[in-house]
Amino acid sequence: MNALGKHVIAEFYECDYETINNHELVEDIMLKSVDLSGATTIKSVFHRFSPYGVSGVVVVSESHFAIHTWPEYGYCAVDVFTCGDLIDNQAALDYLKEKFGSKNVSVVEMKRGVLNLGVDLHHKPVGN
């Protein structure tokens, strides 16, 4: 890969209301998705809005996983930005789809930091 990272933008539709409105559960699911991807968690912050909705981010040594939920519409927006090519984004997305009960997922992936170095960039940053 001749890019510093991958940015996956995923939209989860027809999700379970109770699941995506529970900030503790959403955080647990996001943290597990990080583990399944092979990324390294540094810190997470999640917030529940009133009357509904959750936003949160998991900072990983490889970049971040972020989520915003709209339970009233059964919808979640997820960003997974990871550096290097050793992280399994698909494993994370498959787990999120299952746990959110999503019946329809749309995914766009783009390379970030495309550099003309003439070599593949194989790395997995190590957090402090």
From Swiss-Prot:
The biological pathway it contributes to is: Amine and polyamine biosynthesis; S-adenosylmethioninamine biosynthesis; S-adenosylmethioninamine from S-adenosyl-L-methionine: step 1/1
| Cofactor binding, per record | Binds 1 pyruvoyl group covalently per subunit.
Return the Pfam families for the record: AdoMet_dc (PF02675)
Species name for this entry?
Leptospira interrogans serogroup Icterohaemorrhagiae serovar Lai (strain 56601)
Query: Do the record's keywords include Lyase?
Result: yes
Q: Name one GO biological process term.
A: spermidine biosynthetic process
Task: Mention one GO molecular function.
Answer: adenosylmethionine decarboxylase activity
Q: Keywords of this protein's UniProt record, alphabetized?
A: Autocatalytic cleavage, Decarboxylase, Lyase, Polyamine biosynthesis, Pyruvate, S-adenosyl-L-methionine, Schiff base, Spermidine biosynthesis, Zymogen
Q: Where is this site: Cleavage (non-hydrolytic)?
A: 62-63
Q: What class of enzyme is it?
A: lyase
Which EC numbers characterise this protein's activity in its record? 4.1.1.50
Query: InterPro entries per the record?
Result: AdoMetDC_C, AdoMetDC_fam_prok, AdoMetDC_N, S-AdoMet_deCO2ase_core, S-AdoMet_deCOase_pro-enz
* Ranges that cross the membrane: none
Which modifications occur after translation, per UniProt?
Is synthesized initially as an inactive proenzyme. Formation of the active enzyme involves a self-maturation process in which the active site pyruvoyl group is generated from an internal serine residue via an autocatalytic post-translational modification. Two non-identical subunits are generated from the proenzyme in this reaction, and the pyruvate is formed at the N-terminus of the alpha chain, which is derived from the carboxyl end of the proenzyme.
Q: List the disulfide bonds.
A: none
Catalytic activity as recorded in UniProt? S-adenosyl-L-methionine + H(+) = S-adenosyl 3-(methylsulfanyl)propylamine + CO2
- Quaternary organization: Heterotetramer of two alpha and two beta chains arranged as a dimer of alpha/beta heterodimers.
What gene is behind this protein? speH
Location of Pyruvic acid (Ser) modifications: 63
**Official protein name in the record:** S-adenosylmethionine decarboxylase proenzyme
Record family assignment: Belongs to the prokaryotic AdoMetDC family. Type 1 subfamily.
Active site annotated at which positions?
Answer: 63, 68, 83
